[in-house]
Amino acid sequence: MKKLAVLMITMLLCGAIANAQENLVQYVNPLVGTDFHGHTYPGAIVPFGGVQLSPDTRLHGWDGCSAYHYSDEVIYGFSHTHLSGTGCSDYGDILLMPFTGQASVINSEYCSKFSHSKEIAEPGYYSVMLDKYNVKAELTCTPHVGVHRYTYPADNMPKGIILDLKHRDMVLNSVISYDAKANKIVGLRDSKAWNENQKLNFSMMFSQPITKVEFYVNDQRVDSVNAITGTNCKAIIYFAENTKQVVVKVALSAAALNLNDADKNLKEVPDFDFHKVHHSARELWNEELNKIEVETNDLELKKVFYTALYHCFTSPYLFNDVDGKYRGLDGLTHQAKEHNVYTVFSLWDTYRALHPLLALIDRKRTDDFVYTFMRHYEQGGMLPVWELAAYETWCMIGYHSIPVIWDAYQKGILDHYSDYEKLQMLNAMVASAKLNLLGRPEYAKYGFIPSDFEHESVSKTLEYAFDDWCIAQFAKALGQDDVYQEFIKRSQFYKNIMDAEGFMHPKANGGFLKPFNPKEINNHFTEANSWQYSTYVPHDFNTYVDLMGGTAVAERLLDSLFGTSSLTSGREQVDVTGLIGQYAHGNEPSHHAAYLYNFIGKPWKTQRMTDSIMQSLYTSQPDGLCGNEDCGQMSAWYVLSAMGFYPVCPGDNHYIIGSPMFDKMTINLENGQQFVITAANRSRNACYIQSAKLNGQKYDKSYITFDDIKDGGQLNFVMSTKPNTKWGVGKDKQPENRFEPVITVVPSINAPQQTFKDQLTFTISLHKPVQVSDSKLVFPATTDKIYFTTDGTEPARNSRLEYTGPVTITENTTVKAVSYNEATGYSPVIEAKFYRFAQDKTITLHSKYSEMYSAGGDNALLDGIRGQTNFRLGGWQGYQGKDFEATIDLLNVKDIHHVGVGFLQDTRSWIIFPTSMTVEVSEDNVHFEPYGTYTNQVAANDYEAQIQEYSIDKPARCRYIRIKAKTFGTLPDWHLGAGGDSHIFVDEVTVE
């Protein structure tokens, strides 16, 4: 009786809490981001749920990464897993499609047209009318179970559901098994896409009796069986012709060892009450959304905010089963202990804003994320970079699980871990930072990543430096001074790629690459250009300002960032969207930049710019995101900015104040306290802070701290249409991120080219500027000395070769150089290699190569330096959408017996071998005779990056050799870039 009384009281309390919550679901539009390039999906998910049940309207292409695009007119069916806002495609598992009449397993035949006017998308619920069948499809879910409700027309036509396991990704293996007695179908699907071996089991049950199941393998019907297996398995499930409605519940398991193991997850839905599951999902969403309450009369702003908050609560996804079992990175099944395990960690995006937001309002899940990271380290030897369903995709850069761990530690989330466990976290950080890949060895050796060793070298250097700062701070907190000293030095390596203008500038062969255009999007940056990456020094920004020349210079650079032309050059990069000047809000590298004015005493400019971004680049419409949602990062930026502050440097516990968007916002903290933010006089035109109070006391700092928030309080702003240029300005009022120099900046070896005919003169300089006035810099620095060698030995202070001026060489030479400072010691040693080659022939190019892929100029094809398999390192001339044609002049008539040309194929990157190469020879450059033809034998859909030499061996006498290579042409339908023009990549022409 007592237990019953307690249960009744608990139910009453739950009901009271539910009634007390505001119905915030009504303000969410899951269709936001499904148009333009947002890459979101509109279907049903519960907060951070392991099932994402949503319609699939697109099978291929970049804008089909989530399987749904608002511009599409047909639905192929409803699959149970989807990615939100990613730039790569995966998931779309276990597709169901209801039908009436004649059924087919061919997707072009069973798909149906639909109309957005008959479509409803809400948190935890989706419905649409399938025009072809006149069937109403409704979807809802629990964390592990997708629930469908199909309402059929009242006729006597055949009715049923198509199950398609071939849908979208390459299938490695699949099984469909029918248990007639249990009215149940179970199966599995192993597939390959972004995750090269994703495993998923399913168990589905039906509210109506199955009358018949037809099995299909390779789209051919297989009779008299109850189960099928293969790489193309489908089934047609029939119900009675008078069936009016069917509810289907589909449980998923990524940990299953046996075919029926997903059954245990069906416990979440013990019956077929669709309404109850829908109501539960709705309440779960209201509970999450009520963590932040906003007050405003602007309904549009309220919709934008709560849709953004909704997207923040969709990923990462729950990965373990109801019993805690999950599949690890080692492919084995493990048991989670006192935590949940999650998947889909888009950390290059989400460490910036999503994880800091969750560390503030969802400490329990943040703890689970750190627990998950450590399981990855135990099972895979490293912390995750971009993990997807127990698979490290190696997508994007950095080791950004580290700032998530450090930020959690700073906020006390990891206090319950033992000292030993925290030390293991530090060990995991160090091990991940020192992996022998992705330019990390070169970064440690040279103090930056040379672009001729690793692509995206500038971005990687900058992001590694920030992550290393996080490692250093964590080591310091744990009393590990040796680790601190090592990584605090590494965190200043950004200085080694900074040029005189303050731009982060790629370096190769010991010096800065030239020509250089900060607007050029190229392989030295990750989905960006130098404008968008140059201010990325969040942990030491004020030192960066000093090196640039002071606050006045920094202000001009920031003003130019937002005020210059939005035109970019170089590679077409679909991710670079939402441009304001060269600031690209549609991608992550510059998300912090609008807040940097606070660091130089101009917070009113931050207020103006953040308000402009919020109002111009976010709406409540399907195209309401200006770029990929990126698993919550794009929305988290908005949520935090609407609060009025943003974590420029995750882990330092500072929030940089921008412009609060709402009249009142209440953050309901997990400890029961509330942090309330008010903005008196706020309107769409009044974005400027006039004054502020924190807990009733005058507040004139342009930042707040975690300690100001964690126990609740009030932050009250008074807003105006005019800026108060004095508020938040002053040494003690503005944020400052700087620490003492602990490294000596490396020198730069400067030469006009790497190869030469007779002699070459190079110089060596230090590129650290010295400020002599507010506007003038002396270059190079005069406080350091440079030592160098030209015989390949390591330079040292006692070397006789202290650099004093230009040096001329006449032979192949390896130059090594080091700079020295009395306070900070030696810099890392850098090196450059120069080659003398016999210029016994010249080349005339009849095709124009892409500016991005010049390999150093016209003579690159004759310089004796061959391009590598990784085309991003340079060394290849690229020709897009055209044939390659050139004429070689041997300078005299000669006997030859061999002509060879090197070509590259990297199909994923649109680089495909030419279909053929034709060579002609001539003595007078007028009358040419055929020399030979080479026909390509490698398939275009061979995705292995490879180099082939097209060679023709035949005696001939000539002076001129004309070479023509035929382009593959337009990329076919099977390619992700279908319809685009392929590239020819060529390097090194040999004549013997």
Segment roles from a protein language model:
Residues 20, 737-884:
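Short, compositionally stereotyped local motifs that mark structural "simplifiers"
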Residues 235-238, 804-809, 945-953:
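Exposed aromatic-hydrophobic patches
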Residues 1-21:
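Bacterial Sec-dependent N-terminal signal peptides
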Residues 21-355, 359-403, 409-462, 470, ...:
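Accessory carbohydrate-recognition regions in carbohydrate-active enzymes
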Residues 245, 712, 810-814, 958-960:
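Extracellular Ig-like/FN3 beta-sandwich strand-entry sites
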Residues 691-693, 785-789, 918-920:
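Beta-strand signatures of extracellular beta-sandwich domains
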Residues 868-932, 944-992:
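Aromatic, loop-rich ligand-recognition surfaces of beta-strand-rich domains
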Residues 723-726, 822-826, 967-974:
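Short acidic/polar inter-strand loop motif in beta-rich domains
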